[in-house]
């Protein structure tokens, strides 16, 4: 980790309902490239005395000209709460969620079966296999 990088938090809020701390993160990195999210996670984990696996950072935008990047961070009380409340795509970035991938042919067949029925019957056709 580079010493010339400063991580500041603002608009800090403790969200007791979702068991997390949420904040806006400002990263100051004058004369340097944008700091990787893993490094920001590690610095925030050290600031809040926790492990990097419960820190979720996202939405970073570097200001024109560089030197300052702003984004959001959420620090969960435990990994269970994070898995329960975080969107699946953010969990996948951390390697905590694996999306089951159906084959292209299966997806196309399902789509074409769905086109043949209308209304609420689509749910039953989409969920079940083709009945011949």
Curated annotation (Swiss-Prot):
Residues 101-121 have a biased composition (Basic residues). Component of the small ribosomal subunit. The ribosome is a large ribonucleoprotein complex responsible for the synthesis of proteins in the cell. Required for processing of pre-rRNA and maturation of 40S ribosomal subunits. One of its GO terms (cellular component) is cytoplasm. Residues 90-100 have a biased composition (Basic and acidic residues). It comes from Takifugu rubripes. This is Small ribosomal subunit protein eS24. One of its GO terms (molecular function) is structural constituent of ribosome. It is found in: Cytoplasm. Pfam families: Ribosomal_S24e (PF01282). Component of the small ribosomal subunit.
């Amino acid at each position: 980790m580079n010493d010339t990088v400063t991580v500041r938090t603002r608009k800090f809020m403790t969200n007791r309902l979702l068991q997390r701390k949420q904040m806006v993160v400002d990263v100051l990195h004058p004369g340097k490239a944008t700091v990787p999210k893993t490094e920001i996670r590690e610095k925030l984990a050290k600031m809040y005395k926790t492990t990097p696996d419960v820190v979720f950072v996202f939405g970073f935008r570097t200001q024109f000209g560089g030197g300052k990047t702003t984004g959001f961070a959420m620090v969960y009380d435990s990994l269970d709460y994070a898995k329960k409340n975080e969107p699946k795509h953010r969990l996948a970035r951390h390697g905590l969620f694996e999306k089951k991938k159906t084959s292209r042919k299966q997806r196309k067949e399902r789509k074409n079966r769905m086109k043949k029925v209308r209304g609420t019957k689509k749910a039953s056709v989409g969920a079940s296999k083709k009945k011949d």
